[in-house]
A protein has these predicted regions:
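Acidic, Gly/Ser/Thr-rich repeat motifs that build Ca2+-stabilized beta-propeller blades
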Residues: 25-178
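N-terminal signal peptide c-region/cleavage motif recognized by signal peptidases
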Residues: 20-22
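Bacterial N-terminal signal peptides that target proteins for export
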Residues: 1-11
Length: 178
């Protein structure tokens, strides 16, 4: 009997708490969410990464990597083939269909080493030295750059991963290629 009444007491307390919280839900102040644009005029923005200081690195799929500094200035850092206005151009990076400049992330120790990592489609390793079971070698690569202190340019491109196959043959199926 003692166990049963203890159980019933627990159920009663739980039910009361549930009832009280549901009736208070109607009178609670709920937060409102608002959206605001912090940067406009982009073409197919794909990814963003933020420094602790508030600078925003971002990629545009068919253009390249840029940074919007906390002061509001925008610096175009790494451009793709056929893009203009960037501090450096990389003719091996291309955009076609679903392929292009995609991910960006900052090194956990960015403040000290200034390293940024970028994923993009490249034809740099097409042909000679290409190791794949597919008939073509265009693929995605992961690059590392060092960002200048003034955030206006990058240097020391290092291709870290060179053989991420993105599409073995032409088709109408979307699996990461043209």
């Amino acid at each position: 009997m003692f166990k049963t009444s203890k159980f019933l007491s627990a159920v009663a307390v739980s039910a009361a708490a549930l009832f009280a919280s549901s009736s208070n839900a109607d009178t609670m102040n709920t937060p409102s969410i608002s959206a605001m644009s912090i940067h406009s005029g982009l073409e197919s923005p794909w990814d963003m990464a933020f420094t602790k200081a508030g600078d925003m690195f971002y990629t545009e799929k068919c253009k390249g990597l840029s940074v919007k500094t906390k002061s509001g200035s925008v610096n175009a850092l790494v451009g793709m083939k056929d893009s203009s206005g960037y501090a450096s151009a990389n003719k091996d990076l291309f955009c076609s269909g679903q392929a292009g400049m995609m991910g960006v992330t900052l090194d956990p120790n960015f403040k000290k080493n200034r390293r940024v990592y970028v994923a993009s489609t490249s034809n740099k390793y097409h042909g000679s030295g290409c190791k794949t079971n597919f008939e073509r070698c265009d693929g995605n690569i992961i690059m590392r750059f060092v960002v200048s202190k003034d955030m206006k340019s990058v240097s020391d491109r290092t291709d870290i991963v060179k053989d991420i196959q993105y599409k073995p043959f032409e088709s109408d199926h979307p699996f990461g290629g043209p």
